[in-house]
Amino acid sequence: MSKHKVSPATIAKNKKALHDYTILEKFEAGIVLQGWEVKSIRAGKVQMVDSHVHIKHGEAWLFNCLITPLLSASTHVVADAAATRKLLLNRREINKIMGRIEQKGFTCVPLAMYWKGPRVKVEIALAQGKKVHDKRQAQKDKDWAREKDRLFKKAYK
């Protein structure tokens, strides 16, 4: 029997980002966490729905990622669920993201949080906002693909 508990690799996904943005390029970033945050992440108490990434003073920061503290969290440390958390990226990656964000219509959003060995990683992406008609067309394409799969499944039974 192993000492370490096996946990699924993906902790949380930001499905809203995939709906609202066209993803152009993805990056893997480390994240600076406190002990109680890691415990909460192991328990699955993470929400990434409205989170976003900003570059300030040459450093990447994750905003609005809610990590809800457990009831058994330390009482001598004030737990802020919506705290701003530092992302760990190479200088080259930060410069690339900064260059694209400064262009009109581009932003940086987190897509997923996952385990890579004992560490928590955040997948962030350079993205461009979708227009309403693009979202509608994407939904129509998804619906048609689902219907097509159903028809083929019935035809080949």
Swiss-Prot record:
UniProt-listed GO biological process terms: trans-translation
Instruction: Report the GO terms under cellular component.
Output: cytosol
Swiss-Prot/TrEMBL keywords = Cytoplasm, RNA-binding
The UniProt family comment states:
Belongs to the SmpB family.
| Name of this protein | SsrA-binding protein
SUPFAM superfamilies, per database record? Small protein B (SmpB)
Which residue ranges have biased composition labelled Basic and acidic residues? Answer: 135-157
Question: What domain of life does the native source organism fall in?
Answer: Bacteria
Q: What does this protein do?
A: Required for rescue of stalled ribosomes mediated by trans-translation. Binds to transfer-messenger RNA (tmRNA), required for stable association of tmRNA with ribosomes. tmRNA and SmpB together mimic tRNA shape, replacing the anticodon stem-loop with SmpB. tmRNA is encoded by the ssrA gene; the 2 termini fold to resemble tRNA(Ala) and it encodes a 'tag peptide', a short internal open reading frame. During trans-translation Ala-aminoacylated tmRNA acts like a tRNA, entering the A-site of stalled ribosomes, displacing the stalled mRNA.
PROSITE patterns xrefs: SSRP
**What Gene3D superfamilies does this protein's entry cite?**
2.40.280.10
Q: Where is this region: Disordered?
A: 132-157
Enumerate the GO terms in the molecular function aspect. RNA binding
Record flagged with keyword Aminoacyl-tRNA synthetase: no
Q: Where in the cell is it found?
A: Cytoplasm
User: Which Pfam family, any one, appears in the UniProt record?
Assistant: SmpB
Main subcellular location of this protein, as a coarse class: cytoplasm
